[in-house]
């Protein structure tokens, strides 16, 4: 059982009712495994890697004359040049080199026949193809220094799909279609038209009758008829048309009188033929019955009928019979003939109609092409539809049709597509055949005919059995394939153009890898699925990597996606989260995987279930895809079960094929693994989610991803138990790889010593500080263990941002009151207490990067310097000698961060300038100050500076100093690691010797140890490393060998460490890679502390968002009877209409947690002698409220030190976990309220902070988890005085980024019109907008203290006149004409 009080590095009371049997799978495993199977780095056998399959699908490449062959032998991947951190800082791509081994074979050809007769020459070569971006251990990619994520794509699975759609032409008529969708190649659509003719389209081109396709595939008319119609043999006897009596032909009411061959009535029209009657008729000798003439008149012949005398064709196959034709058959004495029975059950006349439709077009083609064979004509017809206007021969047309669907190079269904085809059509084609077969095409049309007659099943395209996931490995393989196809074409073209001797030809002369480079670069930089990683907090990062997008190449287009695709489908249950999706135009197109779901090898999402046998739940857990779960009866996770696993209630609510039904317990096949399995990670973090409206839950889960990491994060008092899972799988936290004892821990390193099957070891972990993330939040890790602590494998040893004791912590537990307060919380506004600001509760640190480049220009190079023209000394006092700001400087808007000068263009100097140059040297006057200045609305401390210099240019003092300090840090780290290796070596040797006995006497520190004794550990610890060899010689040969092996191993480890260190030092010495034209680049990192202020956006976890409207002094806030002031006041009207009642329950449980925490704090403060026993009793009492927890046994198993440590955490508030759909019940709430001494309605008496009077009503007060979102007022508000103007209209530009103004729009104009404020309105539309002359005059008048003159003509008016002139209209402005005349 996985349920435990432990959650991360703390205790949490979990109220789950059903024991958890399965660990939540790693949240990032989909991305990781997909990329690993694509590249298979570090594995000996890489033949099954995705990348190998791609290359093998392209090679070998032959030229047209068969002179050359290029074969692929295998690929190799190298090591990355820079590590992840370096790549990000330097703005490079974290990648590995890919090489392929290629063999070029030159063939000896027979001069006469041109056939190969032997090998002339063979050359092998290893070619560098390109750098492939490498996935980091946190499943992201670093592209050009920016961290990106490749989102998984949810697309239509290849295979066959049948649909019904409403006809565009005929009213209420349904049109049936069948589509064969490949992964690569031409789509095949089969569709009925309104006249019931069956057509086929290839790639949405013009439709042709389906029989044209069959004929192009080589089927004759008779073959096609036999495939689609039952053949009925009509016998002619006594001028009557007879057929064999078959009872199956008479289902339902009979439409005509059934007569025997003698003309006697057997069954009258309108009656039914029962099985008993049929049997009696057959036994009575009924063999032949009359075929009604009126039915025979409209039937068609099943094969060609020849004249018995002349042997000429009398009637073609599919000739429609009529009175004359039947008479002819009688006259010529035919005994029998065959007809196609299109009246049989599950059959229609669509194929016959298609033959009729194609007859006309083939007749015309016959005349133009002068070819008689109809099959050849059909192939030409398809060629002409696909490539209109091109001349064609019959051989080329046949070859074209064949290649379209049956050539593996052009057409690929993939293994998935083949599996879906076999499943749907009931064919048994081997799964390695990934092209179409003739059988596939025939069976698809046969099934479509069945669907039309109501005997087949229509597919649901939104069913998860028809949609699959393409993860990074497959997406990358597709991109690589696209690039290789281009390369293959280029190689073939090159081979064709080669002439003369080919002896000197090498593989690299043919292969040009530019095509691959461009496709992969494009995919990672501008592809729709490669996205800038959302790194606001660990949750946003984890959910971004679990995202499923229906958009992207080969996916949907959001403008055309309808409601059905976006909607929640029953098969999403346990596979895709029904809650977490963006609001707006992408709603439902971007989804997230559910918590427990996995993706199988074929790309289908699977959900886990426990098997149920005869109403008893077993412990067997299996994963099912949406297709596998069809027809099974599934019980929900909250079903009540007794201790033996038997379902208690005889009738339970179950799911079957997406329907909710009531069924008996014995008919249940499966049961949900957990009540959490329905939702995704973010939604599962919302406690009491089941009490929230879905719209608000959606907002809640989306807003948790926007919460900025706080300076002092605190895990929620009311959690769901999933907080530790997010922390476990987010890379931000450092987890122990192996269990052991913390040997050393400082601000930057943790060393853990332990033992495994190979003996003692010491693991090293690096702790990051003040790193800038993609979203400008600060990334810092805090050590969560101390020296001497014992840690388990996977335990969090350092918390990342937004983490607290190994749990996700995106906000703060604040005391909340639901009440109006002087109108300040109108419309969801939030009132805060000043206490939160004093205690830095909602303070966050943001790091911004500013960069400046020095370029090579025509008239000299730009330069970074302190020597700036026209700048006072005090303005640059914070810069160092190189002109770069010093680390630790507090900068404010307008301060110079990096001094830079740019040479002016060469202008002939005036005599004065020449004199100045003569006096002051070259510099004076011909450079402009182009320094990097701290932008408006940004102030903070400079935390880091990076300087990069191009090869061949001298590094300045600052760059040299940076390198020296980094070197010193690397040396220190290296020294530490060496010390730890020495320590590990001694531990392993001591380990070895403690288990062995001496084979001869040895003297140590004047003490003689006899043969057969063991030297004590404290003595061994004091033995000098160099004297150890002598001691070891007193042991057996095996021990001596083992000792030498240990020494050898550590010598290698130290050498490896030294190499690693040297490499890092070399990278430091390396010249930096900068883009062309750039000679130097400086990056300055500024850290800003943002306290919460009025205008910031805050939210709870239930979609209850609002803006801070007022920050009130602590003394003015309402307070409780014990004097505790409230932290946050929310509007009670925000709850009923939004229907997110979960927040009220959270507040109640939070209050209980805090009150119980206070009781534990009281025990600490009382300092009684037996306080540990008291703590144990109190904590056991609280933990025992949850049934599954077995609180007493757990508390008793803790030693005193551990108990006190956990109690100190609980003193700040007892932590609860209430799982979604399986949380706290009413009786548990009552028990907790009783323990915490809270009134049963959860309300408190409040006093007004200003007057001290008791409030009239009791108020709902408690603790809610509040988040501060990244919509910060400091980054939104700006004010423009004068600034840039738009070029054409001359109006001020818009937006903060461009320092723009606020548009005075149409509605604002109406407002001024309504008030009759004429002059204000005129000023708004002219002087303040686009009257160019007027605004200059107004500025001058204001500057000189004069009256503002009248406004002129707005620029927009001139633009309008110019546009009218462009339409050849002579437009002149009335005033101007008069002026010209005067």
Curated annotation (Swiss-Prot):
It is an enzyme of class 2 (transferase). It catalyses: RNA(n) + a ribonucleoside 5'-triphosphate = RNA(n+1) + diphosphate. Keywords: DNA-directed RNA polymerase, Nucleotidyltransferase, Transcription, Transferase. Its EC number is 2.7.7.6. HAMAP family: RNApol_bact_RpoB. The RNAP catalytic core consists of 2 alpha, 1 beta, 1 beta' and 1 omega subunit. When a sigma factor is associated with the core the holoenzyme is formed, which can initiate transcription. This is DNA-directed RNA polymerase subunit beta. It comes from Aliarcobacter butzleri (strain RM4018).
């Amino acid at each position: 059982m996985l349920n435990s009080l432990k959650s991360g590095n703390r205790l949490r009371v979990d109220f789950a009712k059903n024991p958890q049997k399965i660990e939540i799978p790693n949240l990032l495993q989909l991305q990781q495994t997909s990329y690993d199977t694509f590249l298979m780095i570090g594995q000996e056998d890489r033949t099954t890697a995705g990348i190998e399959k791609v290359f093998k699908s392209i090679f070998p490449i032959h030229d047209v004359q068969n002179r050359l062959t290029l074969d692929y032998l295998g690929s190799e991947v190298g090591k990355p040049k820079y590590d992840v951190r370096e790549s990000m800082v330097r703005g490079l791509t974290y990648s590995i080199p890919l090489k392929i081994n290629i063999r070029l074979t030159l063939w000896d050809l027979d001069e006469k026949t041109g056939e190969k007769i032997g090998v002339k020459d063979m050359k092998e070569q290893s070619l560098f193809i390109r750098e492939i971006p490498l996935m980091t251990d946190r499943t992201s990619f670093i592209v050009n220094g920016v961290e990106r994520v490749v989102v998984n794509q949810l697309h239509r699975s290849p295979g066959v799909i049948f649909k019904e759609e409403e006809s565009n032409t005929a009213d209420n008529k349904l049109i049936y279609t069948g589509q064969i969708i490949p992964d690569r190649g031409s789509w095949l659509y089969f569709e009925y038209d309104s006249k019931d003719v069956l057509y086929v389209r290839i790639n949405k081109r013009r439709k042709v009758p389906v029989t044209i396709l069959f004929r192009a595939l080589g089927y004759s008319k008779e073959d096609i008829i036999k495939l689609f119609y039952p053949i009925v043999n009509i016998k002619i006897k006594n001028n009557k048309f007879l057929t064999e009596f078959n009872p199956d032909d008479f289902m339902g009411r009979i439409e005509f009188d059934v007569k025997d061959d003698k003309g006697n009535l057997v069954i009258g029209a309108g009656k039914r033929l029962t099985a008993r009657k049929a049997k009696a008729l057959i036994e009575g000798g009924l063999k032949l019955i009359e075929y009604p003439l009126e039915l025979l008149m409209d039937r068609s012949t099943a094969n060609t009928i020849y004249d018995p005398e002349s042997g000429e064709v009398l009637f073609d196959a599919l000739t429609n019979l009529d009175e004359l034709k039947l008479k002819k058959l009688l006259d010529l004495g035919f005994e029998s003939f065959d007809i196609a029975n299109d009246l049989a059950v599950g059959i229609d006349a669509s194929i016959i109609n298609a033959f009729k439709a194609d007859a006309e077009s083939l007749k015309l083609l016959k005349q133009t092409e002068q070819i008689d064979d109809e099959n050849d004509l059909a192939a030409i017809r398809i060629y002409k539809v696909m490539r209109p206007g091109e001349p064609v021969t019959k051989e080329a047309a046949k070859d074209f049709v064949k290649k379209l669907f049956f050539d593996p190079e052009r057409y690929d269904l993939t293994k998935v597509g083949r599996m879906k085809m076999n499943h749907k059509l009931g064919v048994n084609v081997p799964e390695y055949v990934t092209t179409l077969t003739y059988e596939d095409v025939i069976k698809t049309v046969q099934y479509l005919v069945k669907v039309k007659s109501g005997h087949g099943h229509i597919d649901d395209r939104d069913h998860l059995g028809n949609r699959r996931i393409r993860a990074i490995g497959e997406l990358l393989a597709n991109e690589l394939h696209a690039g290789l196809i281009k390369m293959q074409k280029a190689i073939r073209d090159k081979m064709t153009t080669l002439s003369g001797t080919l002896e000197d030809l090498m593989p690299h002369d043919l292969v040009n890898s530019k095509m691959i480079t461009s496709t992969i670069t494009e995919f990672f930089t501008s592809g729709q699925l490669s996205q800038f990683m959302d790194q606001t907090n660990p949750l946003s990062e984890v959910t971004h990597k679990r995202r499923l997008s229906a958009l992207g190449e080969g996916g949907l287009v959001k403008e055309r996606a309808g409601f059905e695709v976006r909607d929640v489908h029953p098969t999403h249950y346990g596979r895709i989260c029904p809650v977490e999706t963006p609001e707006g135009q992408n709603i439902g197109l971007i989804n997230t995987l559910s918590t427990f779901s996995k993706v199988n090898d074929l790309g289908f999402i699977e959900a886990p279930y426990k098997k149920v046998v005869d109403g008893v739940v077993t412990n067997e857990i299996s994963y099912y895809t949406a297709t596998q779960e069809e027809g099974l009866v599934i019980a929900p996770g909250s079903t009540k079960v007794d201790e033996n696993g038997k379902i208690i209630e005889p009738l339970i609510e179950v799911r079957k094929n997406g329907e909710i039904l009531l069924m008996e317990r014995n008919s249940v096949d499966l049961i949900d693994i957990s009540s959490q399995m329905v939702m995704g990670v973010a939604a599962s973090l919302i406690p009491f989610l089941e009490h929230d409206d879905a719209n608000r839950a959606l907002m809640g889960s989306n807003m948790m991803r926007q919460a900025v990491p706080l300076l002092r994060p605190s895990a929620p008092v009311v959690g769901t138990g999933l907080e530790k899972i997010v922390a476990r799988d987010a890379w931000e936290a450092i987890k122990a790889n192996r269990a052991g004892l913390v040997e050393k821990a400082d601000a930057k390193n943790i060393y853990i010593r332990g033992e495994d099957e190979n003996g003692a070891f010491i693991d090293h972990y690096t702790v990051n500080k003040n790193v800038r993330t993609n979203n400008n939040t600060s990334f810092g890790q805090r050590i969560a263990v101390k020296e001497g602590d014992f840690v388990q494998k996977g335990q969090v040893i350092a918390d990342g941002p937004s983490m607290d004791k190994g749990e996700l912590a995106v906000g703060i537990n604040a005391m909340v009151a639901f009440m109006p307060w002087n109108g300040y919380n109108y419309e969801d506004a939030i009132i805060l207490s000043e206490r939160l600001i004093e205690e830095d509760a909602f303070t966050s640190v943001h790091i911004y990067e500013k960069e400046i480049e020095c370029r090579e220009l025509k008239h000299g190079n730009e330069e970074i310097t302190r020597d700036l023209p026209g700048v006072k000394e005090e303005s640059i006092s914070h810069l160092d000698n190189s002109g770069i700001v010093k680390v630790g400087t507090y900068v404010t808007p307008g301060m110079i961060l990096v001094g830079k000068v740019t040479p002016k263009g060469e202008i002939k100097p005036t005599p004065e300038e020449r004199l100045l140059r003569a006096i002051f040297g070259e510099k004076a006057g011909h450079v402009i100050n182009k320094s990097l200045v701290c932008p408006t609305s940004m102030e903070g401390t400079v935390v880091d500076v990076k300087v990069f210099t191009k090869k061949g240019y001298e590094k300045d003092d600052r760059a040299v100093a940076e390198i020296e300090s980094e070197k010193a840090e690397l040396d220190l780290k290296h020294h530490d690691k060496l010390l730890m290796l020495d320590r590990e070596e001694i531990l392993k040797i001591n380990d070895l010797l403690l288990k062995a006995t001496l084979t001869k006497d040895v003297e140590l520190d004047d003490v003689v140890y006899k043969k057969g004794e063991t030297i004590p550990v404290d003595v061994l610890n004091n033995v000098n490393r160099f004297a150890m060899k002598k001691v070891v010689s007193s042991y057996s040969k095996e021990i001596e060998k083992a000792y030498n092996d240990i020494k050898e191993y550590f010598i290698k480890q130290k050498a490896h460490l030294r190499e690693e260190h040297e490499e890092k030092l070399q990278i430091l010495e390396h010249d930096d890679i900068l883009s062309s034209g750039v000679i130097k680049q400086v990056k300055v990192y500024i850290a800003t502390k943002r306290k919460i202020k009025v205008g910031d956006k805050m939210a709870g976890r239930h979609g209850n968002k609002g803006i801070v409207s007022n920050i009130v002094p602590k003394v003015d806030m309402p307070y409780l009877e014990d004097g505790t002031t409230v932290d946050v006041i929310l509007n009670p009207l925000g709850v009923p209409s939004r229907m997110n009642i979960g927040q009220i329950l959270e507040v109640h449980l939070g209050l209980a947690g805090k009150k119980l925490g206070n009781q534990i704090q009281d025990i600490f403060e009382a300092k009684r002698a037996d306080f540990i026993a008291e703590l144990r009793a109190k904590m056991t009492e609280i933990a025992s409220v949850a049934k599954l927890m077995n609180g007493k046994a757990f508390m008793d198993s803790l030693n005193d030190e551990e108990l006190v440590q956990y109690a100190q955490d609980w003193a700040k508030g007892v932590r609860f976990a209430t799982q979604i759909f399986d949380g706290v019940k009413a009786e548990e709430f009552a028990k907790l309220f009783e323990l915490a001494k809270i009134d049963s309605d959860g309300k408190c008496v409040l006093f007004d902070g200003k007057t001290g009077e008791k409030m009239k009503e009791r108020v709902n007060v408690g603790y809610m988890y509040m988040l501060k979102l990244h919509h910060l007022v400091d980054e939104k508000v700006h004010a423009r005085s004068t600034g840039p103007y738009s070029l054409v209209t001359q109006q001020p530009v818009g937006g903060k980024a461009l320092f723009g103004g606020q548009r005075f729009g149409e509605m604002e104009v109406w407002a001024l019109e309504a008030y009759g404020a004429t002059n204000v309105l005129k000023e708004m539309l002219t002087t303040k907008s686009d009257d160019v002359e007027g605004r200059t005059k107004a500025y001058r008048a204001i500057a000189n203290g004069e009256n503002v003159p009248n406004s002129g003509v707005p620029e927009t008016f001139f633009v309008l006149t110019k546009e009218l002139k462009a339409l050849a209209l002579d437009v002149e402005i009335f005033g101007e004409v008069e002026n010209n005349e005067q």
